[in-house]
């Protein structure tokens, strides 16, 4: 509700994320882009419609099955800073592996270490989250979302609080994930992500407008290893 009246945060939309594609949705604060991402991530149930992942309606599943589907197929970079303070930076990045299998899976630690190197956090692997700056926490969240090589990556303002160099690094990692076959969605109010996109859409007052295909103009990804 707003001012005592009902309103739609997101108007009806039919949106498809394709494997190997990086889609950017741009919009101002309050435009509805983060609400849309939250619905796609299984965080906020829509009042109407469905979110289909591999043909399964995420919100029609029992809670345990929906949670398993999210953990297995979706990597989320949430808005703000999310970390377990009792764990080290490396352990936070490894969390998706532990949540999925109850134990750390083989090979995941090595990938986590590579990702931390990619976001320039390797020297802080043993640090606690409260020792990190806001920008460092954002970069940790990028590594955590990618550690299990999810089929779908949903990134809410992934470059918020990052300087230009670190923003480029985060976006290159998301671009690499798309090039390796993931369907990647970035919602942002900033311009930089557009240069890494295959497709750009604009959201305003809950309405999603079609944009252009841009892959030909996206910068080449540098090797992160």
Locate each region found by the language model.
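Conserved catalytic motifs of ABC-family nucleotide-binding domains
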Residues: 149
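Conserved ABC transporter NBD signature motif
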Residues: 49-57
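Conserved ABC ATPase signature
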Residues: 128-132, 136
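ABC ATPase NBD coupling module
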Residues: 58-75
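Conserved ABC ATPase "signature" region
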Residues: 57, 106-123
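Helix-to-loop junction immediately C-terminal to a conserved catalytic motif
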Residues: 41
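Catalytic Walker B motif of ABC-type/P-loop ATPase nucleotide-binding domains
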Residues: 153-156
